[in-house]
Every structure is written in C-alpha cells, then in structure tokens.
Amino acid sequence: YGMITAAHEHGAEGMKRAVAAGITSIEHGTMMTEEVMDLMIEKGTYYVPTITAGKAVEEKAKIKGYYPAVVVPKALAIGPQIYNTFGKAYKRGVKICFGTDAGVFTHGENGKEFYYMTQAGMPAMEAIQSATMTPAIMLGIEDEIGSIEAG
C-alpha cells in the first residue's frame, strides 16, 4: 500500500518480525541484536533510538519511590542498554533518524539526543542530518523539506 509505518519495539523477536514484514522504522530498539541490525540494513529499515527517553527513565529510577521496587532494576538498565544499542547500530550501518519519545522527559530537553548520539560515536553533522534530511528521505519528502541550505 506504500504506507510509512513504525513499530514501537524493545525485544529482538518483535523487531525481527516487523522488519521482515517491511516496517519503515523501529522506534526504541532497546534489545536489538546484530541479526536484527543486519536485517534492517538489508531491508532499508530506519532506527529511531530515543536514547533520551531511556536515560530519563534511568534517572527517574534513582529517585526513591518514583517507580515500584519491582520496576527499578529494569528502569536502571534501560538507559545504558539503549545507548549501547544505538552505538552498535550506528557503527554497523543502520540508518538512523532522530527521535525522542517526547513526554517521557521534561519538555524542551529533546536536544539531549544530539549529545547522546555524538557521545556514542556519531559525528555531529550526521546527528544533525538524522533530524533533518534523513527523516525527510524516510518519509519520501526530501524534495520538499529536510535540507539546511544557505539563503
């Protein structure tokens, strides 16, 4: 049908199935494996890592009583996990689009995503392109929006 589709995925099996079925992008991708990364490269699937959301959950887990005790270990682990997954996916060659899962963290802090992306190894210009031209290409509207040009 030519639709742009996204899957909110954390587990590798769900990602593998979504990518195999032709999903346009994977959001979060927390437990992404190298097998999934390779399939994403093969299928041209984009990855929207939302590192800032994972880091925000991790920080909130350090506040006593913020989450139920049973949730705290998982919440503490998600920030480092999603950060490491992003670094591996970027280095492997998965196409990256900027995204933050806004609402998980304080409004106005989405720019932190650039910081996390560059700290994990993405050059600053590629991080900027992940928020401008790359999503425009993913959406098929790169002739209309996405470029930053003089003039």
PLM features: what roles do these ranges have?
Residues I4, Y67-V70, I78-G151:
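His/Asp/Glu-enriched, well-ordered alpha-helical/loop segment
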Residues E58-K62, N110:
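Short acidic, glycine/serine/threonine-rich loops at helix termini
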Residues G11-E13, I51-A53, A102-V104:
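Active-site-proximal loop/turn and secondary-structure-junction residues that shape catalytic pockets
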Residues T33, G54, T134:
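Residue-level detector of flexible, active-site-proximal loop/helix-junction positions
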Residues E34-V36, V57, T106:
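Glycine/Thr-rich phosphate-binding loops of Rossmann-like dinucleotide-binding domains
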Residues T45-V57:
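Non-cysteine beta-strand/loop elements that form the S-adenosyl-L-methionine
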Residues Y1-Y47, A61-K64, L76-I96, D143:
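Histidine/acidic residue-rich metal-binding segments in metalloenzymes
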